[in-house]
């Protein structure tokens, strides 16, 4: 793991290189990048320009297609629900160029990469599995790379709208809200897949878990080291604690997710940055 801490942002690279590491982390083997910045939530044009350049560098580090290779960008999510509309909003702001092939002067065409983009919607709108739509488009267009953009569910409340996560392992649409669909990855689509996501919601169990963490940290600080109570507090596993909270809250809150009240403006800013 490599972390670069700066005044306005932090950038973390995680490489999972072995099956043992994959099992321990609960993620497929691959390269994971997280760009965190509170400035993502704010209307700070100068900082956003810096973050756009940084984000572009990270995307290039995950895949290096040739200039003539076509890239397909997929905006996942339900455009009728603001926290889930990140993908479709990004697609609406992308400059698509695949249809311009052969119509531009040679000098300009050499500098323009063919890009196609689509928002396939969700199965509740189309009646079609998102993965089936994407697979059909890939089989027809034969792009060299797919970039999938999706809204995520945060596992830490301080990451809501403040982190852009990237990986070269693909994406499972709907997994964050317990509605896992067909995987969009190289094994299913036959081409490399870069996933880009932003946590825009958090579930009730995570909010309670984060609150308990703050309480436990304070209790540990005030408890004499070496006592049985101290050891009990220190030995609590994060994942076990989260699962216990989720099970307790389940009958009362159901599938409850929360998003900040300013989500409309923030999702628009995030879409501009990613696009």
Where are these regions (language model features)?
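N-terminal amphipathic/basic leader segments beginning at the initiator methionine
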Residues: 1-29
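Glycine-rich phosphate/diphosphate-binding loop of Rossmann-like nucleotide-binding domains
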Residues: 74, 78-113, 117
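Gly/Ser/Thr-rich loops at beta-strand to alpha-helix junctions
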Residues: 76-84, 124, 151-155
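A structural-propensity feature for long, helix-poor, extended segments
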Residues: 108-138
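An N-terminal, well-structured beta->alpha segment
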Residues: 21-63
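Conserved active-site and cofactor/substrate-binding residues in soluble primary-metabolism enzymes
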Residues: 30, 46, 50, 54, ...
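A structural signal for small-residue-enriched, beta-sheet-centric alpha/beta enzyme cores
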Residues: 118-119, 148-275
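Proline-aspartate-enriched helix->loop->beta-strand connector
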Residues: 138, 143-144
